[in-house]
Amino acid sequence: MLKVVEAFSGIGSQVEALKNIKIDYEVSATVDWEISAIYTYDILHNGKQNLKDYRLHHKESIVDKLTTYNLSSNGKDPITRRAMMAMPTVQLKSLLAAIERTNNLIDITSVNADQLPNDIDVLTYSFPCQDLSVSSFWHNNFSGITKGVGNKSGLLWEIERLLKDFSNKNKPFPKFLLMENVSAILSRHHIDNFNLWKKFLEDLGYYNQVYTLNSNKFNVAQDRQRTFMISVLCETPIIESNVDHYFSLNNLENVDLLKTKNISDYLRLDYDNNQYLHEAILATPNFTESRKKIMENNRILAVDRLANEHLNAATLTTKQDRNPNSGIIKFEKEVIKIGSQYRNLTPRECFLLMGFKENDFDTIIENDLEVLSGKKFLSNARLYKLTGNSIVVPVLEEIFKQINQINTEILKPTVSILQ
């Protein structure tokens, strides 16, 4: 069994990957402060909530509990008590239930070694990319993962703090660390800081394997390049040699899985299906001059009900009604909204392009909360953001296969794979 701790857990793409490849696992703790991610993670991986244990709580008592956590509704700023009091009681109860069911420690800046088990196999950390991304460059933000600047991407160094706490308390380090972020982390602006991070891990005894992987090589119709680092704790030189040899023979950058899926497997173009039609209408913007440019400048993934099967979606980001976006569906004969000439990808299609299953999305929608009359907690804007911030599941599947193989064949046995 792999015992996993997910820092910056999002909606749990790591757990989804482990489920898919049928590796026995246990999530000891998660860490995320954004409330829609917390709730979605819980519903996706633990199923429908039963709030009967919270039936005697009133709003004030629930808020008293929730305000002890550092929660956020936008991933940027903490929620105030006043804002919490404005939320429906059922939403507050559901949020508290989600925190407790996922053992969410919420605030990475306050997590310490005492809160985590002694036998962690894998600690994952997909820290925020805002200060590393290309968009930050265009806004003259070069702070990246510079230590001590107090930005979002700098939360990487909270993992350093946590590992130092492990050391100070003579607590065993996790066997594996798994990092994911944008590939700009390897750019000339950020490579020195990244090398500083790698050196810290090496000094603790970790062997670092860095991969830059594109999801289009993993049978996913999305062009999404991300950088991963698997860090393996090597307690002896022979183990380190064996791990190095393993990665030299099994480099995932050389993988190009047989393509059995194309964009038509992800698009929902059957508008005779009322649910697909409803979602498509919500993803169809009013046609304006700026949206004319969106239509002209972005990939046309389908025309009416016919997909362009040779195309992949561009990288999914946290918004679709923008330029550039991940691709559009153009209307020539199809009319789902008067005056419209195209639509964006729907949240369902985005979830599928990140490697989640359709019934995963249906589970989320079926368990969504009504926060106001006719207004759901998981709005389309929130769903787009959740998927844009996630990790492509089939890529993680191949990474976890490697972690599991190293764990069972190199770290646990004493027999060298070189023999």
Task: Describe the predicted segments one by one.
Residues 44, 245, 331-334:
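Short Gly/aromatic-enriched secondary-structure transition segments
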Residues 2-173, 183-188, 192:
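Core alpha/beta nucleotide-donor-binding catalytic domains of modification enzymes
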Residues 53-61, 244, 409-419:
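Short, flexible loop/turn segments with low-complexity composition
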Residues 282-419:
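C-terminal target-recognition/interaction regions appended to catalytic cores
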Residues 17, 40, 158, 162, ...:
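Amphipathic alpha-helical segments that form well-ordered structural scaffolds
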Residues 111-122, 132-322:
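Class I S-adenosyl-L-methionine
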